[in-house]
């Protein structure tokens, strides 16, 4: 996989009133990924999957705070490698005709290494989990009314020198199908009900310190 064209250009761009600088990297190399995956389906409905990936020269944009001036440098850089191993299970659930759901559980081990990341090389790893539950409550068949409530939660993760706090969100939607052959559909929805989807990444690593304050927004919608 090759980096984007802009990332390999020799340029310097300033932001945040000059306190931030975005720098191009003409020395960027393509990354190479090797992977293996095994999937098992039980009784045609329970899905289990395991995988391992090794990526040489993984590239991503990083942030570094200069030690001799009040400035943050953003630059797409190659890491030595990234390794990831994971297990996934997807389980359907059903109670009569009124309730159906799908539970997905994911466990991941992640390691990232960069031995020449400025003056603070890193070799970091973490185990994190992600769980998703999609619920459908079938309230009525005539007209067809379905209430969907979906939730996701993820434990703490990392990215380069960033720490990514745990996150989660809940969405809900009410769908009504009516008229002949249910040709009309009215949908009311609310996304990120508890305003928790956005995380506040931070850096606290070898003298680097950064705290980000991001905002989450609940939003409503209607479609017909």
Range-by-range predicted roles:
Residues 124-224:
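Conserved C-terminal beta-signal and adjacent last beta-strands/turns
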Residues 38-42, 52, 89-97, 135-139, ...:
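Residue-level signature of outer-membrane beta-barrel architecture
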Residues 23-25, 29, 35, 47-104, ...:
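Outer membrane beta-barrel strand-and-loop segments of large Gram-negative receptors
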Residues 1-3, 34, 44, 52-56, ...:
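Transmembrane beta-strands of outer-membrane beta-barrel pores
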Residues 1-56, 143-150, 163, 182:
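Structural signature of Gram-negative outer-membrane beta-barrels, strongest in the C-terminal barrel
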């Amino acid at each position: 996989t090759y980096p984007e064209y802009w990332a390999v250009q020799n340029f310097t761009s300033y932001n945040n009133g000059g306190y931030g600088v975005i720098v191009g990297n003409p020395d960027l190399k393509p990354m190479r990924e090797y992977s293996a995956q095994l999937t098992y389906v039980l009784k045609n409905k329970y899905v289990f999957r395991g995988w391992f990936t090794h990526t040489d020269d993984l590239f991503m944009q990083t942030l570094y705070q200069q030690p001799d001036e009040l400035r943050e440098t953003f630059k797409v850089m190659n890491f030595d490698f990234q390794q990831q191993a994971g297990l996934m299970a997807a389980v359907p659930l059903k109670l009569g005709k009124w309730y159906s759901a799908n539970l997905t559980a994911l466990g991941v081990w992640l390691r990232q290494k960069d031995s020449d990341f400025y003056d603070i090389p890193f070799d970091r790893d973490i185990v994190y989990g992600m769980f998703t539950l999609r619920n459908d409550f079938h309230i009525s068949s005539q007209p067809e009314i379905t209430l969907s409530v979906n939730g996701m939660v993820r434990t703490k993760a990392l990215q380069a020198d960033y720490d990514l706090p745990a996150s989660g969100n809940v969405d809900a939607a009410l769908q009504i199908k009516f008229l002949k052959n249910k040709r009309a559909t009215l949908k009311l929805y609310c996304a990120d009900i508890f305003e928790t989807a956005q995380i506040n990444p931070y850096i606290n690593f070898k003298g680097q310190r950064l705290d980000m304050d991001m905002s989450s927004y609940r939003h409503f919608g209607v479609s017909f």
